[in-house]
């Protein structure tokens, strides 16, 4: 009996408010659009900051080797063997 009353009340209900007011849908669409743009900008900013931090840390690591020079001589030198005169 209660389910029949609920069904009857649902049939009498007029259109849903969201379907009757398209302006509300447009406003919600604009809010979601702006939300997407803001999130995209924040994501790009974060990626750029991470990339800059990685470059800075790489340069900092390279600074350790700044004072070092490569050897001018080879570790192993070739011996010059002269043939004795005959």
Swiss-Prot record:
The lineage of its organism: Eukaryota, Metazoa, Chordata, Craniata, Vertebrata. This is High affinity immunoglobulin epsilon receptor subunit gamma. GO terms for cellular component: cell surface; external side of plasma membrane; Fc-epsilon receptor I complex; Fc-gamma receptor III complex; membrane raft; plasma membrane. Residues 45-86 are cytoplasmic. Residues 54-82 form the ITAM domain. Disruption phenotype: Knockout mice are resistant to IgE-mediated systemic anaphylaxis. Keywords: Cell membrane, Disulfide bond, IgE-binding protein, Immunity, Innate immunity, Membrane, Metal-binding, Phosphoprotein, Receptor, Signal, Transmembrane, Transmembrane helix. It comes from Mus musculus. The modification Phosphotyrosine is found at residues 65, 76. The modification Phosphothreonine is found at residue 78. Adapter protein containing an immunoreceptor tyrosine-based activation motif (ITAM) that transduces activation signals from various immunoreceptors. As a component of the high-affinity immunoglobulin E (IgE) receptor, mediates allergic inflammatory signaling in mast cells. As a constitutive component of interleukin-3 receptor complex, selectively mediates interleukin 4/IL4 production by basophils, priming T-cells toward effector T-helper 2 subset. Associates with pattern recognition receptors CLEC4D and CLEC4E to form a functional signaling complex in myeloid cells. Expressed in mast cells (at protein level). Expressed in basophils (at protein level). It is a single-pass type I membrane protein. IgE Fc receptor is a tetramer of an alpha chain, a beta chain, and two disulfide linked gamma chains. Associates with FCGR1A; forms a functional signaling complex. The signaling subunit of immunoglobulin gamma (IgG) Fc receptor complex. As a homodimer or a heterodimer of CD247 and FCER1G, associates with the ligand binding subunit FCGR3A to form a functional receptor complex. Associates with CLEC6A. Interacts with CLEC4E. Interacts (via ITAM domain) with SYK (via SH2 domains); activates SYK, enabling integrin-mediated activation of neutrophils and macrophages. Pfam families: ITAM (PF02189), TCR_zetazeta (PF11628). The gene is Fcer1g.
């Amino acid at each position: 009996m209660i389910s029949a009353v609920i069904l009857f009340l649902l049939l009498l209900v007029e259109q849903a408010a969201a379907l009757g007011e398209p302006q509300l849908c447009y406003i919600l669409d604009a809010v979601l659009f702006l939300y997407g743009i803001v999130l995209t900008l924040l994501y790009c900013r974060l990626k750029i900051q991470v990339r800059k931090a990685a470059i800075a840390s790489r340069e900092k690591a390279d600074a350790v080797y700044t004072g070092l020079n490569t050897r001018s001589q080879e570790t192993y030198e070739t011996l010059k063997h002269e043939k004795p005169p005959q």
